[in-house]
């Protein structure tokens, strides 16, 4: 069955509380998807973000925790955990991270003081014990110390049992505050996901390849990463120099110690996927090529130039994962430098690959051209890392424009390019056709979500337009091209 969906991160939804959240507007958006005939909603990672990491959902202090800025304040009010006077409304514009981190934390502190059902927290802690105990303790110590885990005293840094016991007793209140925050987030998300299911909408989640060095994941499982005796990274992740960057990209995350992952039967990965399948129906695997071979750069290098390719045990990993999750919920983000080995890995396990129509018109044989897109692909109009179609077209070279017009059989005006490319994506054989919301709204570079390589100023775009006006237009197209549900 050929399906269609919208790519829109939760932070981009309208909301009076400074950032898109899990409140009324998220439910309204799901109603819109249902009324149009869509069956998929793709989001970016829901993990915690921070100002220090440029608010990137791909740079988090936990690959398991939820981002408290997405919590809906009105639900806290409905549960009598805060008062009406505690609600602050902000003008609808870009995501106000600087304000929202403080504001939502204050609200949650008040809500925690008024919370009485501690048996619910204990049940939640038990259910999520494989990550939450360590995460809540990590957050409590980090608050107390005011620095990252690798700067803590040796006994805490190295997780010595007695030291952890002592600090847990000392910081019990803060520990339970962070358990409470996660309890609220997961409760609100589960409620929203149930609503989506009732409307026949599946949610596509997104799994970043690596956690940050300054994360609970690395502190809790140092043996699963390539660290030295002082727990400093031996190598960090990135991508080599290419056409777009002479020095490559240096991400700075510690790389996996795959030998240890294999030794423990990939237990950490199984838990991670299992955890995320409680939240999502499908999982996009960011930087899929890293499962076949990854670029590692010696720690301390200023660019990615002096890195090297190292083989990863992708075949063994996916064999194991698919024995646990036979429905194969994965989508490979296989864009960029892709070798035959990466293709072979994806095809061996029948994992759908990603194609983007914006890449289609740079050469005649492109695998991104609609007639070359295969059934086992997810076809995008654009992605969070790319300009929306209108912005892309504005900067498109003469040769590529010519190819586009030849492909369409006529020249078209700038304001119509988004419609034409949406049609081409929908008409393809791809099992999933995903339209980025900015393309449905015909927005340009002002609405771009992320500029890779630019550390700050990203992830701020929010919907200001009345998107429901697009309902009849898109409903008709989904019907014409056999993707309406």
From Swiss-Prot:
Cell location: Cytoplasm
E.C. designation(s): 2.4.1.25
A cellular component annotation (GO) from this entry: cytoplasm
Presence of keyword Transferase: yes
GO BP terms, alphabetized: carbohydrate metabolic process
MF GO annotations: 4-alpha-glucanotransferase activity
Keyword terms, alphabetized: Carbohydrate metabolism, Cytoplasm, Glycosyltransferase, Transferase
The UniProt record lists the keyword Cytoplasm: yes
Family matches, as Gene3D superfamilies: Glycosidases
InterPro entries from the UniProt entry: Glyco_hydro_77, Glycoside_hydrolase_SF
Catalysed conversion reaction: Transfers a segment of a (1->4)-alpha-D-glucan to a new position in an acceptor, which may be glucose or a (1->4)-alpha-D-glucan
Family under the similarity heading: Belongs to the disproportionating enzyme family.
Protein name: 4-alpha-glucanotransferase
Organism: Aquifex aeolicus (strain VF5)
């Amino acid at each position: 069955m050929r399906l269609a969906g919208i790519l829109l991160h939760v932070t981009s939804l309208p909301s009076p509380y400074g950032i898109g959240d899990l409140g009324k507007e998220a439910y309204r958006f799901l109603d819109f998807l249902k009324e149009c005939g869509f069956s998929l909603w793709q989001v970016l990672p829901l993990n915690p973000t921070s100002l220090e990491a440029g608010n990137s959902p791909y740079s988090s202090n936990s690959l398991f925790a939820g981002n408290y800025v997405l919590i809906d304040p009105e639900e806290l009010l409905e549960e009598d955990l805060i008062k009406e006077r505690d609600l602050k409304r902000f003008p609808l514009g870009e995501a106000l991270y600087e304000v929202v981190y403080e504001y939502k934390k204050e609200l949650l502190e008040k809500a925690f003081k008024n919370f009485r059902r501690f048996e619910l927290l204990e049940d939640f802690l038990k259910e999520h014990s494989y990550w939450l105990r360590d995460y809540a303790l990590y957050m409590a110590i980090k608050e107390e110390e005011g620095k990252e885990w690798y700067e803590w005293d040796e006994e805490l840094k190295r997780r010595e049992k007695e030291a952890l016991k002592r600090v847990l007793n000392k910081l019990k209140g803060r520990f339970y505050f962070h358990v409470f925050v996660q309890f609220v987030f997961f409760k609100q998300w589960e409620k929203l996901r149930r609503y989506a299911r009732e409307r026949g909408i599946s949610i596509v989640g997104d799994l970043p390849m690596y956690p940050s060095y300054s994360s609970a994941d690395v502190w809790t499982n140092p043996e699963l990463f390539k660290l030295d005796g002082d727990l400093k990274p031996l190598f960090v992740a990135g991508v080599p120099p290419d056409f777009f960057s002479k020095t490559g990209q240096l991400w700075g995350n510690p790389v996996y110690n795959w030998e240890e992952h294999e030794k423990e039967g990939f237990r950490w990965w199984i838990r991670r996927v299992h955890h995320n399948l409680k939240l999502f129906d499908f999982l996009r695997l960011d930087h899929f090529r890293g499962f076949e071979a990854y670029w590692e750069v010696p720690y301390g290098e200023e660019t990615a130039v002096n890195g090297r390719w190292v083989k990863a045990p992708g075949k063994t990993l996916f064999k194991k994962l698919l024995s646990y999750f036979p429905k194969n919920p994965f989508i490979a983000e296989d864009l960029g430098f892709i070798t035959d080995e990466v293709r072979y890995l994806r095809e061996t396990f029948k994992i759908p690959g990603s194609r983007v129509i914006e890449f289609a018109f740079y050469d005649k044989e492109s695998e991104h051209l609609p007639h070359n897109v295969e059934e086992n692909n997810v076809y995008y109009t654009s992605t969070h890392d790319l300009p929306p179609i209108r912005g892309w077209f504005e900067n498109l070279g003469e040769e590529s424009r010519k190819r586009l017009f030849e492909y369409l059989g006529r020249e078209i005006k700038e304001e119509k390019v988004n419609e034409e490319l949406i049609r081409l994506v929908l008409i393809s054989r791809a099992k999933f056709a995903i339209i980025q919301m900015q393309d449905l709204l015909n927005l340009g570079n002002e609405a771009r979500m992320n500029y890779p390589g630019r550390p700050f100023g990203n992830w701020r775009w929010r919907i200001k337009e009345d998107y429901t006006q697009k309902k009849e237009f898109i409903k008709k197209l989904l019907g014409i091209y056999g993707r309406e549900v």
